[in-house]
Structures are given as C-alpha cells and as structure tokens.
Amino acid sequence: MNSNQLRETFLNYFKQLDHEVVPGSSLIPENDPTLLFTNAGMVQFKDVFLGVETRPYQRAVSIQPCMRAGGKHNDLENVGYTARHHTFFEMLGNFSFGDYFKRDAIKFAWDFLTNVLKLPPQRLWVTVFQDDFESESIWLKEMKINPERFSRCGEKDNFWQMRDTGPCGPCTEIFYDHGPTISGGPPGSAEADGDRYVEIWNLVFMQYNRDAKGNLLPLAKPSVDTGMGLERLTAVMQGVHDNYDIDLFQYLLKALRTLLKTEDLHNTSMRVIVDHIRSVAFLIADGVIPSNEGRGYVLRRIIRRAVRHGYKLGQEEPFFYQLTKPLLEEMGGAYPLLRKSQALIEQTIKQEEIQFSNTLTKGLKILDHEMAGLPSRQIPGNLIFQLYDTYGFPPDLTADIARERDFVMDYAGFDKAMERQREQSQQAHQFVANYAQKASIGGETQFVGYETLNSQANVISLLQNDQPINRLNESEKGVVVLDRTPFYAESGGQVGDQGFLYFEKGSFRVKDTKKQGDIYLHIGEMLQGHLNVKDKVRAEVDVSRFDIMRNHSATHLLHEALRRVLGERVMQKGSLVEAKRLRFDFSHAKPLTPEELQAVERLVNQQIQANLLSTIEVMTPEEAKKKGALALFGERYGKEVRVLEMGDFSTEICGGTHTERTGEIGLFKIVSESGCAAGIRRIEALTGKAALDYIESAEQQLRSLSDLLKTNRKNLAAKLSQILEDHRKLEKELAKLKQRLASQQLESLINQVVDVHDIRTLAIRLEAVDRETLRAIVDQLKQKLGKAAIVLATIEEGRIQLVAGVTKNCLEHFNATELLAPIAEKVGGRSGGRPDLAQGAGERPENLEAALAAVPKWIEKKLKE
C-alpha cells in the first residue's frame, strides 16, 4: 500500500464512523503565538479542547502537515542521520470532543491496524500509563491482546499535558516490532532506546484539568486526541525499517540522483536534501518567506542546510529548486495548494540559493582555516557567532560540519555572544515599553478616534527621560498619557497620529503616537505653558489624518485587486500607511507586467468611482472568518476584531482608520513596483491630491519632451525609438572611426618604441583620443611588438586618462598595475586593473611628461631586481 492509498484508507475508515473530515490546517498556527509551527494534528482543535470554541461536529479526522524544526520541537540536526527524524511529516489523527472516550478510541485503533491494514497482532506492542487501570482493562480483557506484548510506563512517556495547568490525561501507545534483526528492547525496558520497536500511534485521553496547585480535577466532557505518523506507518506497510525507503522519499531520491548524476541513494546528504524540500515547499506555500527572524529564519536555515549538502556532493550551481516539480508529482494530488504555489516555491528557493552561494564559499573557507588552527576539537562560541552574524551561517550548519569532522560546538559561548547582541538590540526598543509600564499606574486610555478627531481628556500620566513626572514645562520634550484620545497609535502599518493638546494658556505638539497594551503614548514637545497630571486638555488630531485614512482605505482596495488580478495566493507581507503615500508588500514570485499593473490600478479606481460604502462590524475572529474576512497570516487577535467591508469588494480584519466611502479616496496611482525580498514584491502608490499632482507633473514632463522633440504626444514613443536607433548607428560609426584612427597611428607609434634590454617600451601622450581608443591601441601594440610594456596617456576634459599594457612574457618581472601605479601617483591620481592591463586617471597635467619619461628607467630598475 502506497502513501496516497494510506491517506485515503485512513480518512474513509473514520468517515464511516461519523467523523467529520477536516482539512489539515496551515503550518503557521492561527491565533497562537506560543507555537512557531503546527507540530501536531490537535493544534487546530486546541480551542475546542480548551472549551473556548465549539464546532458543529463532535468527531473529527484529519491529515495534518507538521513541522519539527525550530522552537521547542526541533529535529533539524538529526535529519538525514537517523531513519525516522524529519523536518516535515504528516500526522493522521482522529478526535473526539466530549463524544466517545477510551473504549471506542482503543477499539477503532486496533480494528484499523489489525483488520483494515491487516497488521499481525503479534508484531504490535501496547503501553499504558501506570495508573490508567481503565485502559489496561480495555486492552487486556476486552481487546484480549497478548499480556506479554503489553507494558505500563510512567508519566514521562505516557501522560500528556498541553502546559503546566489545563487539560491533560494519560495516553496509550501502539508500537510496531520490526523484528529481532534490529537492536532494541520493548517499551518500558532498559533497552527501549533501540530501533526495533517504533511507536506508530499515540492515543491521548484528556480527562483531567490540572489546577495551579497541581491537583487533577475530572473534566465534565473528556476528549480524545490521537496521532499517527504517515511516514512511519507507510514504512511498516511497505516492509521497510527506514522511512527514507518508502515511496514518498524514494521518488524524490531518484529525481535527485538524476539531477546530481549520482547512483548513491543512501548518502546522508541526499537524505537531508529530499527531507528539506518537503518542509521548504510547504512553508513557502503557506506564505513564509526567507528572512532573518522567526519562521522566515527557520525556512532560510533549512534551505541553506540543503544547499550546503548539495555543495558536499559537488553541486555548486542552484539545484534545490528543481526538486519542486517531482515533489508536486508525488504530493500535489493530496495538497492542491502546492500546485497553485509552484512558481512561488521555485522562484523563492532559487533566489535564496543564488544569494547563499557566495556566503557559503566564504564561510566554508573561514571555518576551514579556523578549524585547522584550533588547539582542541571544540569550535569556539565566538567563531560560531561570527559566522552566523557576519556571513549568515546558521549555527546548525556549523554544527553539521563539526559533526562530520568529529568536532564539538561551544554552544554556551555562542549563547553568550548572542545574549550580548540581544541586550544591545533591546536597549533601542526599551524606550516605549518602559514608558508604558510606568504610565500604566495612571490607568488605561480609551480610544475615540474612530468617531472623532478631537475630544476633551484628562492627563493621567506624564513621563520624561524614562521617568514619571508631575509637571512638564515649556520647551521640554516628554510623553503625555490621557484617559481618552482621538489619536490613532502606530499599528497595522498605519503611522501614529500627529496633532496638538490644547489647555489653558498652553499647547503640546504631538509628534507621534504609540501604544503599549491599553496605554496610548502622545510623544512630543511643550510649545507653550506647562502641563500637570490631572489637567484637562482638548486633544486635536492634525488634518493629515484624512490623508492617512485615504491611503489606508486604498491599501485594502489594492490588496483585493492584487488577489483578483494575480490570484488568491497573494498575501499581505507588510505595509506602511502615512499621509504622503502608501506602501504595500505582498507575496508574488516575479515582477508584475505593465498589463498587470494597469489592471490592478484600473480595478482600484473603479471601486473609488463606485463610491462604495465602508461599514465596520465588531465580532469574534471566528465570526470574521465565516464572513470571509481576510486576516494577516499568523497574526494574533483578541476576543473581538473590527471587520471593514467596502461594498461587496473587500472584507478584511483591520483596526485602522478609514474613509466612510471609497469615493473620498479620490484617485489612486501606482508610482513604483519592485522586489524587496525573495518572493515578495512592493508597490508604492499615491491617492487624492498627491496622485493628481503626480499625474500633472508627468503630463508636464510629456509636454516638455514633446516640445523638445517637436512632435505630438501620440508620436512621442516612435520619435524616441527613432532617435535611439540613430544614436546606436552613430555609436557604431564612431567605434569604427576610432578603430581606424588607432590603426593609422600604429605605425607612427611603433617608430617611437625604445628597447629596454629585450622589452620593447613605449610611454607617450596622444591627442584627441579617449580612453577606449587608448585601450584599443595598447591591445594592437601588444600584438605587434611581441615582448612589450606600453603606457599611453591623453587629456580628456582637463583630466588625465592613463592605460598601461604588458605582454605575458613580461609578467615574471612586473605587471601592468605595478607599471602604472607610480605614474598615476605623480599626476595626482590612482590606478588599478589586471596584471596585463591597467587603467588610471590624474588631476595634474603639468607632471605628465616627466612621469612618462621615467618609464624606461623604472623598467630597467625592475629588470635588475
């Protein structure tokens, strides 16, 4: 049975048992900042298990893509070296939310393994938690398994909990016995660490709630969470012990063998590469882009590790991206998102490979050099950090190399170096956090800026130089915290508001607004008078907010327009919304064509002309999802979110400020489109009067150009094309004339050559030629003279141009850069180039003749050395 058949068999079995087939969730956990990646099937059901979310079903079955690289669960450094460690795997799971419990869960699992998959019971081994007598009784008395293939284990192995407090419970595990030819004892024995017995299914029974004191209290509705690794189960079904021998990996290994022109399918580097293409492709399809932090950094590490192993196999050109196609052939049917994202995956990987190529070469040279001189077989932490910080060499890549060469890593030293850098970095970010902490003693700030741009308020806290104060005097800078404010704090790409706080006999200029928790920080300067804690003020936001609102609303229209023109896989990756412009970053593998840009711009302006009504509703994140609202991927939202709808065109979760109707945006104009990272494009645009000013300026430039070229705008492109074509023809003619001039001067110059021993030498100034002509003459003289050293000079627009050439048979004595350097120095300039050809320039024409005259003596001196 192959892996595709196993997936289908598993889902169909539980579907017949009234389980809802739930698609696997993204590798990026939604609304859960505690997890870097989805690492188990239960992750998407966590809130259901916790009782904070309800689903229309009580039984579920899923196949969940999982990652074990980065964060608490990290298998990266073991991948390729063992039979079962992977960065990416698929977890088969069935779940009960207060429906069936231990008896049915055990019965379903045993029936599926022994009756559906026909696994012999004598090859299976079962474990239970030592105090879970109920599960033990079900296995031994009801399922009637062999007591000799059963063991009790402690809390470490057979008791599961999500965290220190909350839902938890015992688990029972089913192992497969690969036979006595493989070392290792049964679970629970002293020899249990061997590879003979492999866990294939874990059944978790959530029946308790652990309180803060550690007490286990029974849950009102016990639940079941099970997980079974597809790769391990496939190995069992295909009669192999090593996961890399199953169909999933063999297909990729054969494709890699063809790509690298090698016959070795069991090479560790080959295994690393085929494992890594799976995790890399799924991460990119889920919207992760290589970067230097968070999930993007994990992705970058995995790509670079694969590239390094390709380098070990002699592959120095980009190759890793070419495994995308065979991966899609093997897994694209089960995961359609992979197929939709093929171009993005290939482009992102290829760009990262190219970018890392030079880094890898430099890093390996440095590491080789340093390791050769180490007094012990430990790589110092500061070297690991230097490679990481300066050359982008991930520590686990250095660890790979250390492992291969029998070195150990000084992780403690590396951690210290990282901590020093972290402390330096944190100092720059501490300002706002410190202020917020000290300001919070005055209470929270109520934001009223959605409804109004001015309001009355009370001062609840003042801060200056990182300290709370009672009074802020004239001309002093500081931070004012109010009990209510119309000022929008920087968030979601929208810049913080500016404006004024007015009070009796004075005013405070707000230059920026930031937010920490529920505290709004009005950062600025006292223009007049003084302000005390508890004073009353009138807070007024600057009218530039209207421009910000226009740009923010236009950003939403742009996002939806991009999705409609380029496809729904386009995802927002960042934005900046300020009064003068907007910037929007989004996932896309290649530059937009002029036609695509025009289509996007036209679609946005159509919505502006339609004057769509903007409506805002407050609802739960779950309700927003059902409504089809777009959300920032991986963003953590609170219990309630604001959903902005612009007619029936755009629906997004957003906490920013917006126009009431799209017509208030006025006009939308894209001014640039560029790449800002691998797989990420950036659009900058203008709205309203700024867009109109831009268009009018462009119109004026076109008018000026038309007048200059004496043609109308309709024929402007054709006229310019003709001018450029004429220019190209003239350049060709000029090049021919220069070549002819060089040839004509050749005989005259040869007559001025002097012999310095056996080296034919010429150092002379030419008139009315440029540097390119000098080079052409030098090349021709070298061919004619045999063994020669030549220096030619000219003065072009008051600046000396120098070219020196040396034939190869002179290089044992000196080269062209050495020959030209003293001449360039004498004329107040610099020079450089190759051993056989050098160029230079200078600013002192009065010294040129003497400098050239000294060339024969310089050569003679060199010949005597």
Swiss-Prot record:
<comment type="similarity">
    <text>Belongs to the class-II aminoacyl-tRNA synthetase family.</text>
</comment>
<dbReference type="InterPro" id="IPR023033">
    <property type="entry name" value="Ala_tRNA_ligase_euk/bac"/>
</dbReference>
<feature type="binding site">
    <location>
        <position position="658"/>
    </location>
    <ligand>
        <name>Zn(2+)</name>
    </ligand>
</feature>
<dbReference type="Pfam" id="PF07973">
    <property type="entry name" value="tRNA_SAD"/>
</dbReference>
<keyword id="KW-0547">Nucleotide-binding</keyword>
<dbReference type="GO" id="GO:0002161">
    <property type="term" value="F:aminoacyl-tRNA deacylase activity"/>
</dbReference>
<keyword id="KW-0820">tRNA-binding</keyword>
<feature type="binding site">
    <location>
        <position position="552"/>
    </location>
    <ligand>
        <name>Zn(2+)</name>
    </ligand>
</feature>
<dbReference type="Pfam" id="PF02272">
    <property type="entry name" value="DHHA1"/>
</dbReference>
<dbReference type="InterPro" id="IPR003156">
    <property type="entry name" value="DHHA1_dom"/>
</dbReference>
<dbReference type="GO" id="GO:0006419">
    <property type="term" value="P:alanyl-tRNA aminoacylation"/>
</dbReference>
<dbReference type="InterPro" id="IPR045864">
    <property type="entry name" value="aa-tRNA-synth_II/BPL/LPL"/>
</dbReference>
<dbReference type="GO" id="GO:0005524">
    <property type="term" value="F:ATP binding"/>
</dbReference>
<dbReference type="InterPro" id="IPR050058">
    <property type="entry name" value="Ala-tRNA_ligase"/>
</dbReference>
<keyword id="KW-0648">Protein biosynthesis</keyword>
<feature type="binding site">
    <location>
        <position position="556"/>
    </location>
    <ligand>
        <name>Zn(2+)</name>
    </ligand>
</feature>
<dbReference type="GO" id="GO:0004813">
    <property type="term" value="F:alanine-tRNA ligase activity"/>
</dbReference>
<keyword id="KW-0030">Aminoacyl-tRNA synthetase</keyword>
<dbReference type="InterPro" id="IPR009000">
    <property type="entry name" value="Transl_B-barrel_sf"/>
</dbReference>
<keyword id="KW-0963">Cytoplasm</keyword>
<dbReference type="InterPro" id="IPR018164">
    <property type="entry name" value="Ala-tRNA-synth_IIc_N"/>
</dbReference>
<dbReference type="GO" id="GO:0000049">
    <property type="term" value="F:tRNA binding"/>
</dbReference>
<keyword id="KW-0862">Zinc</keyword>
<feature type="binding site">
    <location>
        <position position="654"/>
    </location>
    <ligand>
        <name>Zn(2+)</name>
    </ligand>
</feature>
<protein>
    <recommendedName>
        <fullName>Alanine--tRNA ligase</fullName>
        <ecNumber>6.1.1.7</ecNumber>
    </recommendedName>
</protein>
<dbReference type="GO" id="GO:0005829">
    <property type="term" value="C:cytosol"/>
</dbReference>
<dbReference type="InterPro" id="IPR018163">
    <property type="entry name" value="Thr/Ala-tRNA-synth_IIc_edit"/>
</dbReference>
<dbReference type="Pfam" id="PF01411">
    <property type="entry name" value="tRNA-synt_2c"/>
</dbReference>
<dbReference type="InterPro" id="IPR012947">
    <property type="entry name" value="tRNA_SAD"/>
</dbReference>
<dbReference type="InterPro" id="IPR018165">
    <property type="entry name" value="Ala-tRNA-synth_IIc_core"/>
</dbReference>
<keyword id="KW-0479">Metal-binding</keyword>
<dbReference type="GO" id="GO:0045892">
    <property type="term" value="P:negative regulation of DNA-templated transcription"/>
</dbReference>
<keyword id="KW-0694">RNA-binding</keyword>
<dbReference type="InterPro" id="IPR018162">
    <property type="entry name" value="Ala-tRNA-ligase_IIc_anticod-bd"/>
</dbReference>
<dbReference type="GO" id="GO:0008270">
    <property type="term" value="F:zinc ion binding"/>
</dbReference>
<keyword id="KW-0436">Ligase</keyword>
<dbReference type="InterPro" id="IPR002318">
    <property type="entry name" value="Ala-tRNA-lgiase_IIc"/>
</dbReference>
<keyword id="KW-0067">ATP-binding</keyword>
<comment type="function">
    <text>Catalyzes the attachment of alanine to tRNA(Ala) in a two-step reaction: alanine is first activated by ATP to form Ala-AMP and then transferred to the acceptor end of tRNA(Ala). Also edits incorrectly charged Ser-tRNA(Ala) and Gly-tRNA(Ala) via its editing domain.</text>
</comment>
